[in-house]
Regions:
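Membrane-embedded beta-barrel scaffold of Gram-negative outer-membrane proteins
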Residues: 1-20, 49-52, 58, 62
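Transmembrane beta-strands of outer-membrane beta-barrel pores
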Residues: 1-6, 42-44, 57-63, 167-169, ...
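Flexible, solvent-exposed coil segments and beta strand-coil junctions
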Residues: 12-22, 77, 137-144, 218-230, ...
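Transmembrane beta-barrel architecture of outer-membrane proteins
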Residues: 23, 32-37, 50, 156-160, ...
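C-terminal beta-signal and terminal closure region of outer-membrane beta-barrel proteins
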Residues: 25-33, 75-106, 205-215, 225-227, ...
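Conserved small-residue
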Residues: 26-30, 45-151, 271, 278
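Residues on the lipid-exposed face of transmembrane beta-strands in outer-membrane beta-barrel proteins
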Residues: 38-42, 161-167, 174, 245-251, ...
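Extracytoplasmic gating/loop element in the C-terminal half of outer-membrane beta-barrel translocons
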Residues: 120, 179-271
């Protein structure tokens, strides 16, 4: 079990706009990380077959507990899409901040029917193919006050599993790693930029009534602001990755002793051989961005994927 409190976190301090300068850095926040770590292992053999397995699993609950006497939240990482992350007392730090979507308007009648209790249009600038945004606070107006927590970039669970097998000179080892209960804000899916190649999910865009209820129509600009920070950009970033796999064979000593070699082993090794994930970006293991305050954890601005490498080698003992 662990319970770690961090005090005096360095954060950009909020200042009024009339200050005329960028926000200074100060010891502003307190945070608590609590959880449990489990470490299990077992080794055994069946005749000439030896085996060993080890499991490491850790659960972490992260919570911001203090932001100063006069503050309960702080805006963190921002982007052309808007504020992407936020720090708020009583919630994970940081968390993704934005609007919730409820599908895509299929026709003009659906736009006209999306009204508040007084009959006013909730999204007067929308048209068929645009996102339907949720009136989270129920005040009959969709505005900045409807932004809410839409995910987080810090995993609940982190796991590692290692396996070792040996049989008559052959050996095999494998290390799997994974994380669960985590999301990524995939900015690389943007389709509102005319000077870059478009992601393949543009092929799934809304093209007419009934074509999709998940992807909006394609347009570089939208009066409905389809590309604002919302749960549309947030994806499940859970994964299991084969971090390392190695297969080897040790020649019998009776074959190598004639050339003054006590042990000779041949092996082939693969790193990052495969990754099991639903994430559509290059790499679900998104750790952070260009912020020095740790406020971009989970924001994928186009991270460079981890290389898949293959190695062939020989171990020789004289």
């Amino acid at each position: 079990l662990n319970n770690k409190k961090t005090s005096g976190m360095l954060l950009a301090m909020p200042v009024p706009a009339y200050a005329g300068d960028s926000a200074p850095t100060g010891n502003l926040g307190d945070m608590v990380n609590s959880g449990v770590e489990i470490d299990l292992g077992y080794r055994g053999h069946i005749s000439d077959f030896n085996y060993g397995v080890k499991l490491n699993a850790s659960y972490n609950h992260n919570e911001l507990t203090y932001l100063g006497d006069d503050a309960t939240f702080i805006g963190c990482s921002s982007h052309k899409l808007g504020t992407l992350t936020r720090g708020e007392v009583g919630k994970p730090f940081p968390f993704f901040y934005g609007w919730k979507t409820d599908g895509v308007f299929q026709n003009a009648a659906e736009v006209a029917a999306y009204t508040n209790s007084e009959g006013a249009l909730l999204q007067p600038n929308a048209q068929a193919g645009d996102f339907r945004f949720v009136d989270v606070n129920g005040d009959g107006v969709i505005n900045d006050d409807d932004r809410t927590k839409i995910g987080k970039g810090i995993p609940d669970w982190t796991l590692g599993l290692s396996l070792n097998l040996e049989w008559k000179g052959f050996d095999f080892s494998m290390l799997l790693q994974g994380q669960f209960g985590v999301q990524a804000f995939n900015v690389s899916r943007r389709t509102d930029l005319y000077y870059i190649n478009l992601p393949k999910n543009i092929l799934n865009r809304w093209t007419g009534e009934g074509s999709t209820n998940s992807y909006p129509r394609f347009a570089f600009s939208s009066a409905n602001e389809n590309y604002r920070a919302s749960d549309y950009w947030v994806e499940d970033a859970s994964f299991v990755r084969a971090r390392n796999m190695q297969f080897g064979y040790t020649l019998p000593a009776k074959l190598t002793k004639h050339v003054a070699i006590s042990r000779l082993r041949l092996y082939v090794q693969a790193e990052n051989l495969f990754t099991l994930t639903k994430y559509t970006g290059c790499d679900p293991e998104v750790t952070g961005g260009n912020s020095g305050y740790g406020t971009e954890v989970g924001i994928d601005r186009g991270v460079y994927p981890q290389n898949r490498t293959f190695t062939f080698g020989v171990n020789v003992n004289f």
